[in-house]
UniProtKB/Swiss-Prot annotation:
UniProt keyword annotation of tRNA-binding present: no
Record-linked Gene3D superfamilies: Leucine Aminopeptidase, subunit E, domain 1, Zn peptidases
EC number of this enzyme: 3.4.11.1, 3.4.11.10
GO MF annotations in UniProt: manganese ion binding; metalloaminopeptidase activity
Active site: K275, R349
Protein's UniProt keywords contain Cytoplasm: yes
Protein name per Swiss-Prot or TrEMBL: Probable cytosol aminopeptidase
HAMAP family according to UniProt: Cytosol_peptidase_M17 (MF_00181)
Species, as recorded: Allorhizobium ampelinum (strain ATCC BAA-846 / DSM 112012 / S4) (Agrobacterium vitis (strain S4))
Length: 497
Protein backbone atom coordinates (compact mmCIF):
# COMPACT_ATOMS: atom_id res chain seq x y z
CA UNK A 1 0.00 0.00 0.00
CA UNK A 2 1.11 3.60 -0.47
CA UNK A 3 2.92 5.11 2.47
CA UNK A 4 1.06 8.08 3.88
CA UNK A 5 3.57 10.89 4.27
CA UNK A 6 2.68 14.01 6.22
CA UNK A 7 5.23 16.64 5.26
CA UNK A 8 6.05 19.81 7.17
CA UNK A 9 8.78 22.41 6.70
CA UNK A 10 10.99 24.01 9.35
CA UNK A 11 14.09 26.24 9.49
CA UNK A 12 15.56 24.12 12.30
CA UNK A 13 14.75 21.00 14.26
CA UNK A 14 15.54 19.28 17.53
CA UNK A 15 16.40 15.64 16.99
CA UNK A 16 14.20 13.14 18.76
CA UNK A 17 13.85 9.40 18.35
CA UNK A 18 13.45 8.44 14.71
CA UNK A 19 15.23 8.53 11.39
CA UNK A 20 17.44 11.38 10.22
CA UNK A 21 18.23 11.90 6.54
CA UNK A 22 20.96 14.27 5.41
CA UNK A 23 22.03 15.39 1.96
CA UNK A 24 25.71 15.54 1.12
CA UNK A 25 27.42 17.21 -1.81
CA UNK A 26 30.20 15.09 -3.30
CA UNK A 27 33.02 17.55 -2.67
CA UNK A 28 31.89 18.73 0.78
CA UNK A 29 33.35 17.30 3.97
CA UNK A 30 30.16 16.82 5.98
CA UNK A 31 26.48 16.22 5.28
CA UNK A 32 23.70 18.69 6.04
CA UNK A 33 22.94 19.13 9.74
CA UNK A 34 26.15 17.43 10.84
CA UNK A 35 26.60 19.62 13.91
CA UNK A 36 23.15 18.64 15.16
CA UNK A 37 23.02 15.04 14.01
CA UNK A 38 26.62 13.90 14.42
CA UNK A 39 28.22 15.64 17.38
CA UNK A 40 30.75 12.84 17.83
CA UNK A 41 31.94 12.93 14.20
CA UNK A 42 31.18 9.30 13.42
CA UNK A 43 30.10 10.06 9.85
CA UNK A 44 33.63 10.64 8.58
CA UNK A 45 34.74 7.24 9.89
CA UNK A 46 31.69 5.47 8.48
CA UNK A 47 32.10 7.14 5.10
CA UNK A 48 35.77 6.19 4.92
CA UNK A 49 35.01 2.58 5.87
CA UNK A 50 32.23 2.32 3.28
CA UNK A 51 34.21 4.32 0.67
CA UNK A 52 31.16 6.55 0.36
CA UNK A 53 31.78 9.28 -2.23
CA UNK A 54 28.30 10.90 -2.14
CA UNK A 55 27.69 10.14 -5.80
CA UNK A 56 24.29 11.26 -7.01
CA UNK A 57 21.46 9.16 -5.52
CA UNK A 58 23.83 6.98 -3.48
CA UNK A 59 22.98 6.09 0.13
CA UNK A 60 24.98 5.46 3.30
CA UNK A 61 22.97 4.00 6.19
CA UNK A 62 24.65 4.07 9.62
CA UNK A 63 23.64 3.66 13.23
CA UNK A 64 23.00 6.98 14.90
CA UNK A 65 26.13 8.44 16.51
CA UNK A 66 26.64 8.45 20.24
CA UNK A 67 25.06 11.54 21.74
CA UNK A 68 22.36 11.78 19.09
CA UNK A 69 18.71 11.17 19.91
CA UNK A 70 18.11 9.67 16.47
CA UNK A 71 17.87 5.93 15.89
CA UNK A 72 19.37 5.91 12.38
CA UNK A 73 21.24 8.28 10.11
CA UNK A 74 21.02 7.99 6.34
CA UNK A 75 23.19 10.17 4.16
CA UNK A 76 22.04 10.68 0.57
CA UNK A 77 24.61 11.67 -2.01
CA UNK A 78 23.69 14.62 -4.18
CA UNK A 79 26.72 14.33 -6.44
CA UNK A 80 28.60 17.44 -7.51
CA UNK A 81 26.62 20.65 -7.23
CA UNK A 82 27.65 21.68 -10.74
CA UNK A 83 26.04 18.55 -12.18
CA UNK A 84 22.63 18.96 -10.51
CA UNK A 85 19.66 19.77 -12.75
CA UNK A 86 16.13 20.76 -11.77
CA UNK A 87 14.55 17.31 -11.80
CA UNK A 88 17.34 15.90 -9.61
CA UNK A 89 15.55 17.36 -6.58
CA UNK A 90 12.59 15.12 -7.42
CA UNK A 91 14.93 12.15 -7.66
CA UNK A 92 16.60 12.95 -4.34
CA UNK A 93 13.18 13.12 -2.71
CA UNK A 94 12.36 9.75 -4.20
CA UNK A 95 15.56 8.23 -2.83
CA UNK A 96 14.67 9.61 0.60
CA UNK A 97 11.19 8.08 0.48
CA UNK A 98 12.63 4.71 -0.53
CA UNK A 99 14.52 4.55 2.76
CA UNK A 100 11.72 5.32 5.23
CA UNK A 101 10.42 1.83 5.90
CA UNK A 102 9.42 1.30 9.53
CA UNK A 103 9.99 4.92 10.54
CA UNK A 104 7.27 7.02 12.15
CA UNK A 105 9.21 10.27 12.48
CA UNK A 106 11.75 11.48 9.94
CA UNK A 107 13.86 14.63 9.93
CA UNK A 108 15.49 15.59 6.63
CA UNK A 109 18.35 18.10 6.59
CA UNK A 110 18.64 19.66 3.14
CA UNK A 111 21.06 22.59 3.44
CA UNK A 112 24.29 20.75 2.71
CA UNK A 113 27.58 22.55 2.28
CA UNK A 114 28.24 23.18 -1.39
CA UNK A 115 24.57 23.03 -2.43
CA UNK A 116 22.44 26.02 -3.32
CA UNK A 117 18.92 24.96 -2.50
CA UNK A 118 15.91 27.06 -3.45
CA UNK A 119 12.29 26.95 -2.35
CA UNK A 120 11.51 25.37 -5.72
CA UNK A 121 14.09 22.66 -5.06
CA UNK A 122 12.60 21.89 -1.65
CA UNK A 123 9.11 21.82 -3.16
CA UNK A 124 10.33 19.33 -5.76
CA UNK A 125 12.06 17.23 -3.09
CA UNK A 126 8.71 16.94 -1.30
CA UNK A 127 6.94 16.08 -4.56
CA UNK A 128 9.52 13.38 -5.25
CA UNK A 129 8.97 11.83 -1.82
CA UNK A 130 5.22 11.64 -2.34
CA UNK A 131 5.46 10.26 -5.87
CA UNK A 132 7.87 7.52 -4.73
CA UNK A 133 5.63 6.61 -1.78
CA UNK A 134 2.82 5.60 -4.15
CA UNK A 135 1.97 1.97 -4.77
CA UNK A 136 -1.14 0.25 -6.13
CA UNK A 137 -2.33 -2.80 -4.23
CA UNK A 138 -6.03 -2.04 -3.84
CA UNK A 139 -7.00 -5.57 -4.82
CA UNK A 140 -4.56 -7.52 -2.65
CA UNK A 141 -6.38 -9.20 0.22
CA UNK A 142 -3.25 -10.44 1.98
CA UNK A 143 -0.76 -7.96 3.33
CA UNK A 144 2.95 -8.45 3.34
CA UNK A 145 4.32 -9.39 6.75
CA UNK A 146 5.96 -6.01 7.26
CA UNK A 147 2.79 -4.08 6.35
CA UNK A 148 1.42 -4.81 9.82
CA UNK A 149 4.46 -3.12 11.31
CA UNK A 150 4.24 -0.04 9.12
CA UNK A 151 3.00 3.16 10.78
CA UNK A 152 -0.34 4.57 9.65
CA UNK A 153 1.47 7.78 8.71
CA UNK A 154 5.06 8.96 8.55
CA UNK A 155 5.75 12.44 9.90
CA UNK A 156 8.35 14.14 7.70
CA UNK A 157 10.08 17.40 8.63
CA UNK A 158 12.11 19.05 5.88
CA UNK A 159 14.70 21.30 7.52
CA UNK A 160 15.97 24.19 5.41
CA UNK A 161 16.55 27.93 5.63
CA UNK A 162 13.95 28.44 2.89
CA UNK A 163 11.27 26.51 4.79
CA UNK A 164 8.63 29.25 4.78
CA UNK A 165 8.86 29.92 1.05
CA UNK A 166 9.00 26.19 0.27
CA UNK A 167 5.93 25.51 2.38
CA UNK A 168 3.97 28.19 0.53
CA UNK A 169 5.06 26.84 -2.84
CA UNK A 170 4.21 23.28 -1.95
CA UNK A 171 0.77 24.24 -0.65
CA UNK A 172 0.05 26.37 -3.71
CA UNK A 173 1.49 24.10 -6.39
CA UNK A 174 3.25 20.96 -5.23
CA UNK A 175 0.31 19.10 -3.75
CA UNK A 176 -1.72 19.75 -6.90
CA UNK A 177 0.99 18.20 -9.07
CA UNK A 178 1.25 15.13 -6.85
CA UNK A 179 -2.51 14.60 -6.81
CA UNK A 180 -2.74 14.95 -10.59
CA UNK A 181 0.02 12.42 -11.23
CA UNK A 182 -1.39 9.93 -8.73
CA UNK A 183 -4.88 10.29 -10.22
CA UNK A 184 -3.44 9.38 -13.62
CA UNK A 185 -1.49 6.44 -12.19
CA UNK A 186 -4.52 5.09 -10.37
CA UNK A 187 -6.69 5.19 -13.47
CA UNK A 188 -4.12 3.37 -15.60
CA UNK A 189 -3.57 0.76 -12.90
CA UNK A 190 -7.28 0.00 -12.44
CA UNK A 191 -8.65 -3.14 -14.14
CA UNK A 192 -10.94 -2.60 -17.10
CA UNK A 193 -13.86 -4.42 -15.48
CA UNK A 194 -13.88 -1.63 -12.89
CA UNK A 195 -13.10 1.30 -15.18
CA UNK A 196 -15.28 1.38 -18.28
CA UNK A 197 -16.09 4.44 -20.40
CA UNK A 198 -19.01 5.46 -18.17
CA UNK A 199 -16.99 5.03 -14.99
CA UNK A 200 -14.11 7.00 -16.47
CA UNK A 201 -16.51 9.79 -17.41
CA UNK A 202 -17.73 9.80 -13.81
CA UNK A 203 -14.13 10.43 -12.68
CA UNK A 204 -14.04 13.45 -14.97
CA UNK A 205 -17.34 14.66 -13.56
CA UNK A 206 -15.80 14.58 -10.08
CA UNK A 207 -13.51 17.47 -11.08
CA UNK A 208 -16.52 19.76 -10.73
CA UNK A 209 -15.62 19.86 -7.03
CA UNK A 210 -12.48 21.80 -8.03
CA UNK A 211 -14.38 24.27 -10.20
CA UNK A 212 -13.96 22.48 -13.53
CA UNK A 213 -16.99 22.63 -15.83
CA UNK A 214 -17.71 19.13 -17.14
CA UNK A 215 -20.04 17.88 -19.87
CA UNK A 216 -20.48 14.21 -20.75
CA UNK A 217 -21.65 13.47 -24.29
CA UNK A 218 -23.56 10.22 -24.74
CA UNK A 219 -23.62 7.88 -27.71
CA UNK A 220 -26.78 9.55 -29.01
CA UNK A 221 -25.27 13.02 -28.77
CA UNK A 222 -22.10 11.91 -30.53
CA UNK A 223 -24.15 10.31 -33.30
CA UNK A 224 -26.03 13.57 -33.83
CA UNK A 225 -22.66 15.31 -34.25
CA UNK A 226 -21.57 12.77 -36.86
CA UNK A 227 -18.76 11.12 -34.88
CA UNK A 228 -18.76 7.99 -37.01
CA UNK A 229 -15.08 7.22 -36.49
CA UNK A 230 -15.25 7.14 -32.69
CA UNK A 231 -18.58 5.33 -32.64
CA UNK A 232 -17.31 2.72 -35.09
CA UNK A 233 -14.68 1.67 -32.57
CA UNK A 234 -17.24 1.48 -29.77
CA UNK A 235 -19.88 -0.55 -31.61
CA UNK A 236 -18.38 -3.91 -30.71
CA UNK A 237 -18.74 -3.36 -26.97
CA UNK A 238 -21.84 -3.53 -24.80
CA UNK A 239 -20.35 -0.70 -22.75
CA UNK A 240 -21.42 2.63 -24.28
CA UNK A 241 -18.84 5.26 -25.24
CA UNK A 242 -18.57 8.69 -23.74
CA UNK A 243 -16.90 11.97 -24.64
CA UNK A 244 -15.90 13.96 -21.55
CA UNK A 245 -15.45 17.70 -22.06
CA UNK A 246 -13.74 19.58 -19.22
CA UNK A 247 -13.23 23.34 -19.02
CA UNK A 248 -11.01 25.17 -16.53
CA UNK A 249 -11.59 28.91 -16.76
CA UNK A 250 -8.70 30.38 -14.80
CA UNK A 251 -7.65 33.01 -17.33
CA UNK A 252 -9.24 36.15 -18.69
CA UNK A 253 -12.88 35.61 -19.75
CA UNK A 254 -12.05 36.58 -23.33
CA UNK A 255 -8.81 34.59 -23.36
CA UNK A 256 -8.37 31.92 -26.04
CA UNK A 257 -8.19 28.47 -24.44
CA UNK A 258 -5.50 25.85 -24.84
CA UNK A 259 -6.64 22.27 -25.34
CA UNK A 260 -5.56 18.77 -24.38
CA UNK A 261 -7.17 15.67 -25.87
CA UNK A 262 -6.67 12.14 -24.56
CA UNK A 263 -7.20 8.72 -26.10
CA UNK A 264 -9.29 6.73 -23.63
CA UNK A 265 -9.60 3.16 -24.89
CA UNK A 266 -10.36 1.51 -21.56
CA UNK A 267 -9.53 -1.91 -22.97
CA UNK A 268 -8.20 -2.76 -26.40
CA UNK A 269 -8.55 -6.32 -27.64
CA UNK A 270 -7.73 -5.12 -31.14
CA UNK A 271 -11.31 -5.81 -32.19
CA UNK A 272 -11.76 -8.19 -35.13
CA UNK A 273 -8.04 -7.68 -35.88
CA UNK A 274 -7.52 -9.26 -32.49
CA UNK A 275 -4.26 -9.00 -30.58
CA UNK A 276 -2.27 -12.05 -29.46
CA UNK A 277 -3.22 -13.33 -26.01
CA UNK A 278 0.24 -12.79 -24.55
CA UNK A 279 0.37 -9.41 -22.86
CA UNK A 280 -3.20 -8.45 -23.77
CA UNK A 281 -3.89 -7.79 -20.08
CA UNK A 282 -1.73 -4.68 -20.38
CA UNK A 283 -4.30 -3.19 -22.73
CA UNK A 284 -6.21 -1.95 -19.70
CA UNK A 285 -3.64 0.85 -19.93
CA UNK A 286 -4.64 1.94 -23.43
CA UNK A 287 -6.34 4.93 -21.85
CA UNK A 288 -3.07 6.40 -20.60
CA UNK A 289 -3.54 9.52 -22.72
CA UNK A 290 -6.95 10.23 -21.22
CA UNK A 291 -5.55 9.53 -17.74
CA UNK A 292 -2.83 12.13 -18.30
CA UNK A 293 -5.36 14.72 -19.48
CA UNK A 294 -7.68 14.25 -16.50
CA UNK A 295 -4.65 14.35 -14.18
CA UNK A 296 -3.50 17.58 -15.82
CA UNK A 297 -6.93 19.19 -15.52
CA UNK A 298 -6.99 18.23 -11.83
CA UNK A 299 -3.59 19.85 -11.33
CA UNK A 300 -4.47 23.05 -13.19
CA UNK A 301 -7.70 23.46 -11.23
CA UNK A 302 -6.20 22.52 -7.85
CA UNK A 303 -3.42 25.09 -8.18
CA UNK A 304 -5.81 27.63 -9.71
CA UNK A 305 -3.75 28.05 -12.85
CA UNK A 306 -4.24 31.39 -14.57
CA UNK A 307 -5.16 29.89 -17.91
CA UNK A 308 -8.23 28.77 -19.83
CA UNK A 309 -7.82 25.08 -20.55
CA UNK A 310 -9.94 22.47 -22.29
CA UNK A 311 -9.59 18.75 -21.62
CA UNK A 312 -11.38 16.23 -23.85
CA UNK A 313 -11.44 12.47 -23.33
CA UNK A 314 -12.58 10.04 -26.02
CA UNK A 315 -13.73 7.02 -23.98
CA UNK A 316 -14.47 3.69 -25.67
CA UNK A 317 -13.84 -0.04 -25.40
CA UNK A 318 -12.58 -1.96 -28.47
CA UNK A 319 -14.16 -5.43 -28.46
CA UNK A 320 -14.85 -8.15 -31.07
CA UNK A 321 -18.50 -9.14 -31.07
CA UNK A 322 -21.08 -9.72 -33.80
CA UNK A 323 -21.67 -5.99 -34.11
CA UNK A 324 -17.99 -5.05 -34.19
CA UNK A 325 -16.39 -2.98 -36.89
CA UNK A 326 -14.78 -5.03 -39.67
CA UNK A 327 -11.63 -4.55 -41.74
CA UNK A 328 -12.81 -2.96 -44.97
CA UNK A 329 -15.58 -0.92 -43.35
CA UNK A 330 -15.76 2.74 -44.32
CA UNK A 331 -16.81 5.27 -41.69
CA UNK A 332 -17.52 8.98 -41.91
CA UNK A 333 -15.83 11.17 -39.34
CA UNK A 334 -17.27 14.33 -37.80
CA UNK A 335 -15.16 16.30 -40.27
CA UNK A 336 -17.01 14.69 -43.17
CA UNK A 337 -13.85 12.89 -44.30
CA UNK A 338 -14.26 9.17 -44.92
CA UNK A 339 -11.96 6.50 -43.54
CA UNK A 340 -11.39 2.95 -44.72
CA UNK A 341 -10.73 0.72 -41.72
CA UNK A 342 -7.85 -1.55 -42.73
CA UNK A 343 -7.05 -2.76 -39.22
CA UNK A 344 -9.47 -2.51 -36.31
CA UNK A 345 -6.50 -2.51 -33.94
CA UNK A 346 -5.54 0.93 -35.26
CA UNK A 347 -8.49 2.31 -33.33
CA UNK A 348 -6.98 5.07 -31.22
CA UNK A 349 -6.60 7.42 -34.18
CA UNK A 350 -10.27 6.88 -35.03
CA UNK A 351 -11.25 7.97 -31.54
CA UNK A 352 -8.91 10.95 -31.58
CA UNK A 353 -9.82 12.28 -35.02
CA UNK A 354 -13.40 12.99 -33.97
CA UNK A 355 -12.31 14.37 -30.59
CA UNK A 356 -9.77 16.69 -32.25
CA UNK A 357 -12.26 17.93 -34.82
CA UNK A 358 -14.91 18.52 -32.15
CA UNK A 359 -12.45 20.45 -29.99
CA UNK A 360 -11.22 22.63 -32.84
CA UNK A 361 -14.68 23.30 -34.22
CA UNK A 362 -16.25 24.21 -30.88
CA UNK A 363 -13.51 25.95 -28.90
CA UNK A 364 -11.13 27.43 -31.52
CA UNK A 365 -8.14 26.83 -29.19
CA UNK A 366 -4.74 28.50 -29.39
CA UNK A 367 -3.26 25.02 -29.71
CA UNK A 368 -4.22 21.38 -29.32
CA UNK A 369 -2.06 18.67 -27.79
CA UNK A 370 -3.25 15.10 -27.91
CA UNK A 371 -1.79 12.26 -25.86
CA UNK A 372 -2.21 8.63 -26.79
CA UNK A 373 -0.75 5.19 -26.27
CA UNK A 374 -1.06 5.06 -30.02
CA UNK A 375 1.51 2.77 -31.64
CA UNK A 376 3.85 -0.07 -30.87
CA UNK A 377 6.06 1.44 -33.57
CA UNK A 378 7.09 4.27 -31.25
CA UNK A 379 8.52 1.66 -28.87
CA UNK A 380 10.58 0.23 -31.70
CA UNK A 381 11.91 3.70 -32.48
CA UNK A 382 12.41 5.17 -29.00
CA UNK A 383 12.05 2.24 -26.56
CA UNK A 384 10.35 3.38 -23.36
CA UNK A 385 12.75 6.22 -22.61
CA UNK A 386 11.18 8.98 -24.72
CA UNK A 387 7.68 9.73 -25.93
CA UNK A 388 7.31 10.57 -29.59
CA UNK A 389 6.54 14.20 -30.42
CA UNK A 390 4.92 15.13 -33.72
CA UNK A 391 3.89 18.71 -34.45
CA UNK A 392 2.90 21.13 -37.18
CA UNK A 393 4.22 24.08 -35.16
CA UNK A 394 7.88 24.65 -34.26
CA UNK A 395 7.18 27.00 -31.35
CA UNK A 396 4.82 24.56 -29.68
CA UNK A 397 7.26 21.71 -30.29
CA UNK A 398 10.18 23.64 -28.79
CA UNK A 399 8.13 24.56 -25.73
CA UNK A 400 7.23 20.91 -25.24
CA UNK A 401 10.83 19.76 -25.64
CA UNK A 402 11.94 22.34 -23.07
CA UNK A 403 9.29 21.19 -20.58
CA UNK A 404 10.36 17.59 -21.17
CA UNK A 405 13.96 18.38 -20.26
CA UNK A 406 12.88 20.28 -17.15
CA UNK A 407 10.65 17.49 -15.84
CA UNK A 408 12.61 14.52 -17.22
CA UNK A 409 9.45 13.41 -19.05
CA UNK A 410 11.49 13.29 -22.21
CA UNK A 411 10.28 13.77 -25.77
CA UNK A 412 11.89 13.16 -29.15
CA UNK A 413 10.61 15.03 -32.18
CA UNK A 414 9.69 12.80 -35.09
CA UNK A 415 9.19 13.77 -38.76
CA UNK A 416 6.02 14.58 -40.66
CA UNK A 417 5.71 15.23 -44.39
CA UNK A 418 3.78 14.88 -47.62
CA UNK A 419 5.55 11.68 -48.61
CA UNK A 420 4.44 10.03 -45.37
CA UNK A 421 0.94 11.42 -45.80
CA UNK A 422 0.55 9.66 -49.16
CA UNK A 423 0.93 6.33 -47.39
CA UNK A 424 -2.53 6.65 -45.83
CA UNK A 425 -4.37 7.43 -49.07
CA UNK A 426 -7.12 4.88 -49.77
CA UNK A 427 -8.50 3.47 -53.02
CA UNK A 428 -12.04 3.51 -51.61
CA UNK A 429 -12.22 6.43 -49.15
CA UNK A 430 -10.49 9.70 -48.36
CA UNK A 431 -7.92 7.85 -46.27
CA UNK A 432 -7.21 4.56 -44.55
CA UNK A 433 -6.42 4.05 -40.89
CA UNK A 434 -3.05 2.38 -41.35
CA UNK A 435 -0.19 3.08 -43.71
CA UNK A 436 1.47 -0.30 -43.77
CA UNK A 437 4.32 -1.89 -41.89
CA UNK A 438 6.91 0.86 -42.05
CA UNK A 439 6.91 4.20 -40.24
CA UNK A 440 3.83 3.23 -38.26
CA UNK A 441 4.09 5.93 -35.63
CA UNK A 442 4.61 8.57 -38.33
CA UNK A 443 1.68 7.52 -40.51
CA UNK A 444 -0.53 7.45 -37.40
CA UNK A 445 0.48 11.05 -36.71
CA UNK A 446 -0.13 12.00 -40.35
CA UNK A 447 -3.63 10.59 -40.00
CA UNK A 448 -4.33 12.83 -37.00
CA UNK A 449 -2.86 15.85 -38.76
CA UNK A 450 -5.67 15.66 -41.32
CA UNK A 451 -8.13 16.65 -38.58
CA UNK A 452 -6.50 19.72 -37.04
CA UNK A 453 -6.56 22.26 -39.87
CA UNK A 454 -4.18 25.17 -39.35
CA UNK A 455 -4.39 25.11 -35.56
CA UNK A 456 -1.01 24.61 -33.85
CA UNK A 457 -1.02 20.97 -32.80
CA UNK A 458 1.19 18.37 -31.21
CA UNK A 459 0.71 14.64 -30.87
CA UNK A 460 2.48 12.80 -28.06
CA UNK A 461 2.74 9.05 -28.61
CA UNK A 462 3.19 7.79 -25.05
CA UNK A 463 2.83 4.07 -25.71
CA UNK A 464 6.27 3.44 -24.24
CA UNK A 465 6.15 5.84 -21.31
CA UNK A 466 2.63 5.68 -19.84
CA UNK A 467 3.05 2.19 -18.41
CA UNK A 468 5.66 -0.51 -17.94
CA UNK A 469 8.41 2.08 -18.31
CA UNK A 470 11.63 1.59 -16.35
CA UNK A 471 11.21 2.05 -12.61
CA UNK A 472 13.10 5.00 -11.23
CA UNK A 473 13.55 7.12 -8.12
CA UNK A 474 10.05 8.64 -8.26
CA UNK A 475 8.00 5.74 -9.57
CA UNK A 476 7.91 2.04 -8.76
CA UNK A 477 4.40 1.54 -10.17
CA UNK A 478 3.40 -0.09 -13.46
CA UNK A 479 1.61 3.13 -14.40
CA UNK A 480 3.78 6.24 -14.53
CA UNK A 481 1.35 9.16 -14.84
CA UNK A 482 3.52 10.40 -17.73
CA UNK A 483 2.38 13.69 -19.19
CA UNK A 484 0.89 15.39 -16.15
CA UNK A 485 4.10 17.04 -14.93
CA UNK A 486 5.26 17.66 -18.49
CA UNK A 487 2.15 19.55 -19.54
CA UNK A 488 1.77 21.40 -16.26
CA UNK A 489 5.35 22.65 -16.73
CA UNK A 490 4.53 23.62 -20.31
CA UNK A 491 1.61 25.73 -19.12
CA UNK A 492 3.70 27.37 -16.38
CA UNK A 493 6.59 28.17 -18.68
CA UNK A 494 4.84 29.45 -21.76
CA UNK A 495 1.08 29.88 -21.52
CA UNK A 496 0.02 30.97 -18.05
CA UNK A 497 -0.84 34.63 -17.46
Amino acid sequence: MSMKLEISFAPSALIEAGLVLSLKEAEATLPAGAATVDPSGIFAKAAATAKFKAKAMSVLDILAPTGSQADRLIVIGAGKAADLVDHDWLRLGGVAAANLKGSEAVTVFLDADGLTITAEGVRDFAIGMLLRAYSFDDYKTKKKDDDDKAPSAVQITLVTAVADAAERLFAAEGRAVVDGVLLARNLVNLPANVLGPVEFADRAKALEALGVEVEILTETEMASLGMGALLGVAQGSVRPPRLAVMQWKGGAPEGQPIAFIGKGVVFDTGGISIKPAGGMEDMKGDMGGAAAVIGLMHTLAARKAKVNAIGILGLVENMPDGNAQRPGDIVTSMSGQTIEVINTDAEGRLVLCDALWYCNDRFKPAFMINLATLTGAILVALANLHAGLFSNDDTLAENLLKAGLSTNERLWRMPLGKDYDKLIDSKFADMKNTGGRYGGSITAAQFLKRFVGDTPWAHLDIAGTAMASPKDEINQSWASGFGVRLLDQLVRDAYEA
